[in-house]
């Protein structure tokens, strides 16, 4: 009897101990932080990306790029600091994302793939792109998938494009292509541009951002249907993924994605082959003569000199002797009245013209309503520089009446062309204006500004531009050639 009781007591003690252990283990497991909680606790959102014009890069003003801007907004939503890390290639990106203690997510212009890799998951998509076969102008244009057979083709290793070609190879076993982890999209386009390879496969957004640097590249055909870009997250709980998806859905609904798309892609198609080729030449042959003047004005006025240089190029192609039938003259194409107001005694003197035009632009920008914030403020200032503040105000009022935001360039630029249509300008205070030309003016300046920002990164100074991966066709001289600089516009 006593032995039985003792046995029961021992069993009860064992069960109690086991229960306590399991309870503690359960509590410990329940208290393990989720992916979202870890980010919030650390106060840092670690994001891995690629270094390219379409994703992320650094200029003198700091970090920038479509993916950077979007990730920054997400970090702000979480109330944490954003920390950007860059990968050498896509395999490296996915490897770092999957390792324990790695980045919280990858924002790198990725199209969902790697279905066999359970360690990677993808968010909702946020930007539609189309994969495109790229060839060199002057070569025979492929028009269908079977035309790829026998061509020298290179794509990024580990990319969705490599997966697409692998699928095509099942249908055409003789198809050959190379995957490389030592190049980026910029390098692939350069190789096509100079003839080192025959073809490559890139997404439409990457081509849009880079084509101006490589005027010889052309789209052969779309290789498949449009697909959405997404962020990639490591496997684990859904807490951070749910927050990412909620953010992206809200960004789409509230217009953030459209504004970022307009900022980075809304002006990329303004240069054709001739324009891109000419700009590449002038970048090497003309800008060096006046760069110091732009930099001096930029420093004095606390304004990015490259934006001032972009205005100068749009106005005169950096020609100090430029004139027009309307009487504007000089590198910044100043009217006599504006020149006098800005203290310019000789409009044909490039230094005076740059100083006067720069001062005028900054003055216009400072006079805009405080409700207009950057970067829109600079785009509005460009519009006013071209069309005048009165007509710009007409367009803003028109936007407001249409239920649009009068402080957003994306909305107001839709109204400017109406200023040339009687049914609309008859209702405005200041009447007719060539608003469509102003939209093109702003788009052109923004595109030139983008190019200058990219090619004047710290690692691409001076003669390094000509030797960099950003190929400037036909331009390999570090010293400017002489030209008359007296073309009439």
Curated annotation (Swiss-Prot):
Biological function: Murein-degrading enzyme that degrades murein glycan strands and insoluble, high-molecular weight murein sacculi, with the concomitant formation of a 1,6-anhydromuramoyl product. Lytic transglycosylases (LTs) play an integral role in the metabolism of the peptidoglycan (PG) sacculus. Their lytic action creates space within the PG sacculus to allow for its expansion as well as for the insertion of various structures such as secretion systems and flagella.
- What InterPro entries does the annotation carry? Lysozyme-like_dom_sf, MltF, Solute-binding_3/MltF_N, Transglyc_AS, Transglycosylase_SLT_dom_1
Question: Which organism's genome codes for this protein?
Answer: Pseudomonas aeruginosa (strain UCBPP-PA14)
Domain comment from the record reads as follows: The N-terminal domain does not have lytic activity and probably modulates enzymatic activity. The C-terminal domain is the catalytic active domain.
Entry EC no(s)? 4.2.2.n1
Q: Which GO terms describe its biological process?
A: cell wall macromolecule catabolic process; cell wall organization; peptidoglycan catabolic process
- Its name, as the record gives it, is Membrane-bound lytic murein transglycosylase F
Q: What is its main location?
A: membrane
> Catalytic site residues?
315
The signal peptide annotation in the UniProt record is: 1-32
| Region described as Disordered | 466-489
Please name the NCBIfam families in this protein's record.
PRK10859.1
Q: Which reaction does it catalyse?
A: Exolytic cleavage of the (1->4)-beta-glycosidic linkage between N-acetylmuramic acid (MurNAc) and N-acetylglucosamine (GlcNAc) residues in peptidoglycan, from either the reducing or the non-reducing ends of the peptidoglycan chains, with concomitant formation of a 1,6-anhydrobond in the MurNAc residue
Q: Which residues form a coiled coil?
A: none
* Recorded family membership: In the N-terminal section; belongs to the bacterial solute-binding protein 3 family.
- One of the Pfam families matching this protein, by short name: SLT
Question: Per UniProt, what is one GO molecular function of this protein?
Answer: peptidoglycan lytic transglycosylase activity
Q: Where is this region: Non-LT domain?
A: 33-268
Its keywords, alphabetically, are:
Cell outer membrane, Cell wall biogenesis/degradation, Lyase, Membrane, Signal
